[in-house]
């Protein structure tokens, strides 16, 4: 498990929550699903991801540190639910009815697809672009694609091509 400068108390709280919800699910489902691998390697604005084939949960250490309580209460069960749904039902829609059922009926957690954490500290630089109706912020990756002539982006509202400001 990679720690990425997270206090041990936070890592322990994550493990407690993971084990608590896994035990709860195993009891309700009458199964003995194993504990998933846990790492703190998620980057960017995603709070976490569930890797089905490797049965692993990757958590964002920056967002975890900045939003510990809500993160542990919501994100850990959210990602665990993806793995449990995959084990229980096979490959289904990521946030479909099976996942919602697993979250609400089995894990007892509200089924929310996205987090509401402040992203300023993990958001990368953006580049301003304009169209007829508004200003847009393009990521470094999209900006570089425009500069290299590999992509053209259009406004979803007015349809005009975006131009660097």
Swiss-Prot record:
Main location class: cytoplasm
Pfam families: SprT-like (PF10263), Zn_ribbon_SprT (PF17283)
Enzyme active site: 79
Cofactor: how bound: Binds 1 zinc ion.
Cellular localization per UniProt: Cytoplasm
InterPro entries, A to Z: SprT-like_domain, SprT_Zn_ribbon, Uncharacterised_SprT
Recorded GO MF terms: zinc ion binding
Alphabetized UniProt keyword annotations: Cytoplasm, Metal-binding, Zinc
SprT-like domain boundaries: 20-163
Gene3D superfamilies in the record: Metalloproteases ('zincins'), catalytic domain (3.30.2010.10)
Family: Belongs to the SprT family.
Protein name stated in the entry: Protein SprT
Source species: Escherichia coli O139:H28 (strain E24377A / ETEC)
Name of encoding gene: sprT
């Amino acid at each position: 498990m990679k720690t990425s400068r997270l206090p041990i108390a936070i890592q322990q709280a994550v493990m407690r929550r993971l084990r608590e919800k896994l035990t709860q699910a195993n009891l309700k489902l009458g199964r003995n699903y194993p504990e998933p691998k846990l790492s703190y390697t998620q980057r960017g604005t995603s709070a976490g991801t569930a890797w089905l084939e490797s049965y692993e949960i990757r958590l964002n250490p920056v967002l975890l540190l900045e939003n510990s309580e809500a993160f542990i209460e919501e994100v850990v069960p959210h990602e665990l639910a993806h793995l449990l749904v995959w084990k229980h039902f096979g490959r289904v829609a990521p946030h479909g009815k099976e996942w919602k059922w697993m979250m609400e009926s089995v894990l007892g957690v509200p089924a929310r697809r996205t987090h509401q954490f402040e992203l300023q500290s993990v958001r990368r630089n953006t580049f301003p672009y304009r169209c007829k109706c508004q200003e847009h912020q393009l990521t470094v990756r999209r900006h570089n694609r425009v500069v290299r002539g590999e992509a053209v982006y259009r406004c979803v509202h007015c349809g005009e091509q975006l131009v660097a400001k």
